[in-house]
């Protein structure tokens, strides 16, 4: 697994953790919530300008970015524009993907 794929999968994991924070009945601490929001948004912004070298890699990256941007509460003024750009990229890559779980997951978030 290359570096971009591992970074995208890590962002997916963090965004999932943020989305489901507290669902297990555990208390939500504000410092944990704020740290996760900041970490997810910083990772999104660091991956935003990158492109996958294959359609699967690009799809995983788009999925991670959509998960991350939708999970965070922070916005420094460019989040909606970035989300639209990722959606445009996702629609381009969806046409190239074969039927797969990755394609279904990406369609779900589009």
Positions of predicted regions on the chain:
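Amphipathic alpha-helical repeat scaffolds of TPR domains
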Residues: 2-27, 51-74, 99-110
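Domain-start "cap" segments at the beginnings of catalytic or binding domains
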Residues: 5-8, 12, 37, 41-47
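Small-residue hotspots
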Residues: 8, 15, 83, 90-93
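Helix-turn-helix repeat elements of alpha-solenoid scaffolds
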Residues: 28-45, 76-89
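Generic signature of intrinsically disordered, low-complexity segments enriched in small/polar residues
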Residues: 36, 51, 72, 77-79, ...
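Alpha-helical junction/boundary sensor with strong preference for TPR arrays
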Residues: 43-51, 90, 94-101
């Amino acid at each position: 697994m290359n570096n971009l794929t591992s970074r995208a999968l890590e962002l997916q994991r963090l965004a999932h953790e943020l989305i489901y924070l507290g669902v297990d009945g555990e208390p939500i601490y504000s410092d944990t919530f704020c740290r996760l929001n900041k970490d997810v948004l910083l990772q999104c912004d660091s991956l935003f300008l990158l492109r996958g070298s294959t359609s699967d890699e690009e799809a995983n990256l788009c999925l991670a970015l959509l998960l991350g941007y939708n999970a965070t509460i922070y916005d420094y003024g460019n989040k909606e524009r970035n989300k639209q750009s990722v959606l445009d990229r996702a629609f381009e890559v969806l046409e190239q993907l074969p039927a797969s779980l990755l394609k279904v997951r990406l369609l779900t978030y589009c």
